[in-house]
A protein has these predicted regions:
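Catalytic center-proximal scaffold of phosphoryl-transfer enzymes
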Residues: 29, 141-147, 152-546
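Short, flexible loop/hinge motifs at secondary-structure junctions
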Residues: 1-165, 205, 235, 282-341, ...
Length: 546
């Protein structure tokens, strides 16, 4: 029966009205489902349209569109500073810019004023003026030469710090401009040439890689002490082309040090090799056995490795030969016994040498970093919720509710770090379960994501047991940004020496900044210049709090 007019509805019997209402409800449900499909199709079309726009920008050589804006969780959960009007009123206004009280005056110049007759003398108005004398200094070294009775020639040595016709001051300036100032070799040559220095690009490159062994030893010492004594190691990685091939740079850092390591892979094997340092050591011990059991390696393989006559190997070749002798290289099963056993042996060597000490590894949930005592970044976890694309208002509201609950919980974790207690830790664990264990939000993708984050409970709540570790990897991303800037300006590296120089010098520059040291003074101290002496950086990295 048609439902065209209100008059016809009045003549309907109750059963007919019920049938009509049921048909209308079915029609509304059909239209609602169709609307959801259209909304989902519209969202998909928008994504495809944006992908096409990005591809057009790439083909035109234009810069890519900026990434998704951050949700603002970090700033929104910061505790506001207490208002102290009386203290603010008592504080005198400051002039902008760095203070001049730390400067030492090299000379004093008295300026006279053309005062007319009858003027009264009122003393001096003192103004500090800074200037710099940037000019080349050319020195002719006349080296004595002596012919010994046995036919040899003895020549006087050049002063320490002279490299290829360039003095230590020029060497320090080139290193500072390139690694801290992020200037290319061509621009350094242009600046120095304009100032009157006769220098070529080849000489600049030679200065950048000179005395690399000195800085490499200090970088290794900083890395060894930093990952063990800092209490935590925040890690991240990024792409870095080397010798025309795609490579990856891994960042290691804390609030006291930074180190970079570049290699052809970002697998867990590569990460463990970096943690182990420059030594190639494989050890089958209790830590390695626990690793293999956690990876679900076959018990027969584990028993064969544990019962072998040799349990430590000093090179990759020896370890590979041992795996082949046990027949593991011929197995085609999952998980791969060669890969898992190699990871376990490297982890066993790290544990045997106590490379990490009591440090926690903090990461963005990338799989290669999931080793040892591990913590996860809350900003990356919340970002997964922030990046969901809702198809209707119901899904949008579900996302907003989940985000607000995560924000409140993140703020509570910040407060916990200031005053940790076992009682509050249990309360926060219960709150975590209520937020991430719940279901039925009305948005399937959100429900799956919350369950995934709940499975990461141990890593996300590591801060309850170790309140000294950060809640995010923002510091790692800041360190990585230095390398990304260098990559955008200079491109990739060609030689292994150039790659190592970049990693070492950028890491030392960031370490000096975190230790509140002048990288310029540090270079002067290491190059033998009369600058403030700076002790070994590894000794300045404070031990982890007990």
């Amino acid at each position: 029966m048609a439902s065209g007019s209100s008059d016809s509805l009045e003549t309907l019997s109750p059963p007919e009205l019920i049938g009509l209402v049921r048909r209308l409800i079915g029609e509304v449900e059909r239209l609602g489902k169709e609307n959801e499909k259209l909304a989902a199709g519209l969202a998909s079309a928008k994504r495809e349209n944006q992908e096409l726009k990005d591809e057009i920008r790439r083909l035109k050589g234009l810069p890519p569109r900026p990434p998704m804006k951050p949700s603002g969780m970090e700033t929104a959960t910061d505790r506001p500073a207490p208002e102290t009007p009386s203290a603010a009123e008592a504080t005198p206004p400051h002039r902008r810019g760095p203070g001049v009280s730390k400067l030492s005056v090299d000379r004093t110049v008295t300026l006279t004023a053309p005062a007319p007759a009858g003027s009264r003398y009122k003393g001096y108005e003192e103004i500090i003026v800074q200037d710099i004398a940037f000019k080349p200094e050319v020195t002719l070294y006349r080296r004595e030469r002596w012919a010994t009775p046995d036919g040899r020639t003895v020549t006087a040595d050049l002063p320490a710090g002279v490299v290829g016709g360039c003095g230590p001051n020029l060497h320090r300036l080139v290193l500072t401009l390139h690694f801290q100032g992020q200037m290319t070799c061509e621009r350094i040559v242009a600046v120095l040439t304009a100032a009157g220095v006769a220098i070529s690009k080849r000489q600049v490159v030679r200065l950048l890689t000179a005395k690399l062994d000195l800085f490499r030893a200090e970088d290794e010492a900083v890395f060894t002490v930093g990952i063990r004594a800092s209490g935590y190691v925040s890690v991240d990685d990024t792409g870095a082309r080397h010798a025309g091939r795609a490579c990856y740079t891994t960042q290691f850092g804390s609030d006291r040090f930074t180190a970079f390591r570049t290699g052809p892979s970002k697998s867990r094997l590569a990460f463990l090799r970096n943690l182990l340092g420059g030594t190639a050591l494989y050890a089958i011990n209790a830590a390695a056995a626990a690793y293999m059991r956690a990876a679900n390696l076959a018990h027969g393989v584990i028993d064969a490795l544990l019962s072998a006559d040799v349990l430590e190997f000093g090179s990759e070749a020896e370890w590979t030969a041992h795996l082949a002798a046990l027949g593991l290289t011929e197995l085609r099963v999952a998980p791969d016994p060669v890969r898992v056993a190699s990871e376990a042996a490297l982890w066993g060597a790290i544990a045997a040498e106590d490379r990490l000490g009591n440090s926690v590894i903090l990461s963005d949930d990338a799989g290669q970093f999931h080793v040892g005592d591990h913590a996860l970044c809350w900003v990356h976890a919340e970002r997964l919720v922030h990046k969901l694309v809702p198809a209707n208002d119901k899904q949008r509201n579900a996302i907003e509710v989940a985000k607000r609950m995560i924000w409140w919980f993140y703020g509570s974790l910040k407060e916990y770090k200031l005053a940790p207690s076992p009682q509050q830790a249990e309360v926060l664990r219960a709150r975590f379960d209520r937020i991430f264990k719940r279901g039925g939000t009305g948005y399937v993708m959100l429900d799956r994501l919350l369950r995934r984050l709940f499975r990461n409970k141990d890593g996300l709540l590591r801060v309850l047991d170790r309140p000294e570790i950060p809640l995010n990897t923002n510091a790692s991303e800041n360190d990585i940004r230095t390398l990304v800037t260098k990559r955008k300006i200079s491109g990739g590296t060609v030689s292994d020496k150039g790659r190592d120089t970049r990693d070492i010098m950028l890491g030392l520059a960031k370490t000096c900044m975190k230790l509140k040291l002048s990288f310029y003074d540090y270079l002067g101290s290491r190059l033998g210049l009369p600058s403030p002496p700076i002790p070994p950086l590894a000794g300045l990295i404070r031990p982890a709090p007990s």
